[in-house]
């Protein structure tokens, strides 16, 4: 499917697909009309990459993760390590946001009490 169709179907902005292709994370094929075409499997990987980026994984780490995935089952341990590190960072962010929310709630209670 072409860039726009892929973007609509998978809710991936065309700019993001271009970024992934420029960084070797996504391979497309040139159609006779000059448009880029992407397969279903490649787009599913792009969706996973987007989730990982939204979770805080940096592009360089994402590229490393993708290279490891291409190497197969021998790299499962390293990929798990990267995912666990990403998860740990997410939990820390959640904790910090919860602390900020607790402070705001405290200030609200204080103002209501006056």
Question: What kind of feature is each model-predicted range?
Answer:
Residues 19:
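DNA-binding alpha-helical recognition surfaces that contact promoter or target DNA
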Residues 6, 13-16:
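Short glycine/proline-centered loop/turn elements that form peptide/ligand docking sites
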Residues 10-11, 34:
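Conserved beta-strand-loop-alpha-helix junction that forms the acyl-donor binding cleft
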Residues 2-8, 22, 27, 40-114:
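Arg/Lys-rich, alpha-helical DNA-contact motif
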Residues 27-33, 37:
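Beta-hairpin "wing" of winged helix-turn-helix
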